[in-house]
Structures are given as C-alpha cells and as structure tokens.
Amino acid sequence: MSKLMTLYMLFEALDEGRVQLDTRLPVSTKARQMQGSTMFLNENDRPTVEELIKGIIVLSGNDACIVVAEGLSGTEDAFARQMTERGRALGLTESTFVNASGWPAEGHVMSAHDLGILGLHLVQDFPEYYKFFALTEFPFDNRAPANRFNRNPLLDLGIGADGLKT
C-alpha cells in the first residue's frame, strides 16, 4: 500500500510541473536489482513517467517505485523521508515510510486507517489520474507477457470496483 503514497508524491510532482507524463527517468542499478514484482527495468531504459505510473499500478513494480523516488528526490532514502513528511501533512499519523515500494523493512509501517485517508486524498486530489487505477493490463515493452495483468482481482469481478491497489 506504500506504493499509493509514492503515486501521491508523483501526482503532486505532475501537478506542480516538476515532471510531465512524457518525462523520461533513468534506471539505476539499485532499481534494476529490486526484487519482488517488477517491470523488468534495466539500466539502459528511460521509462516515461506515464509508463512508471502504469508499472506501479498494474504490475506493482518495485523497480518503478525506486526510479520515481530517485527521479524526484535523488535517493530513495530522501524520498521516503519526504513521503513520511507529506503523509503527516495529509493526516497519516500512523505511517512511517522507509522506502518507496513498501518492501519489508524495519520501521516501515502503514495503518489501515491511514490507508483509507490516503485513498480518499488520491481520489479527491488527483481525479485526472484516477483512470490509471482501472487499467487491467500493461504490456510494458512485451518483456514479460504473462506479467502484464493487474494484480487487483477485484477489477474483473463485475462488482463495480474500479481501482486503487490490492
């Protein structure tokens, strides 16, 4: 769920004009080496911000989160500190971020209550980007065709679910 805070920070950067959807960001070795769910990025890639948004939402890309963090703040550590600060300003009093992806780490916590607050802020503060959360697949460069589908099983149940994260 930490990825939602990373997206909040990225949507804010878009609204402030610090990046655009077509801005390309470099991929570091740290991002390439990230484990878990990824976009399969490598150091030769320069994905656009829009591709990174889709990679985080649809593919749950941990590597994409690091690219965003480094692109906006220089380092993932600096970005995580900014996530916590911004979260406090939004009312997230029970969450502390130590990385951009939510990868298990000591001191990294997010409460269900704070998740609800953040979800509401995402929908209300950035309605123009909400459409990304309803995407059911993202075949990024056809790198892993079997990995292109959204990990949110609620999207395909026909119950009216239209997004955010699982």
Label every model-predicted segment.
Residues 32-65, 148-164:
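Conserved catalytic neighborhood of penicillin-recognizing serine enzymes
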Residues 28-30, 57-60, 68-69, 98-101, ...:
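Active-site-proximal beta-strand/loop segments in catalytic clefts of secreted hydrolases
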Residues 75-166:
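Penicillin-recognizing serine hydrolase domain
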Residues 16-39, 134-143:
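Short, glycine/proline-biased beta-turn/loop segments that scaffold the active-site neighborhood
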Residues 1-5, 43-51, 55-62, 73-81, ...:
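Soluble non-cytosolic domains of exported or imported proteins
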Residues 32-38, 66-67, 95-105:
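Surface-exposed aromatic
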Residues 1-25, 115:
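Active-site SXXK
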Residues 12-16, 71, 121:
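Active-site catalytic microenvironments for nucleophilic, acid-base chemistry
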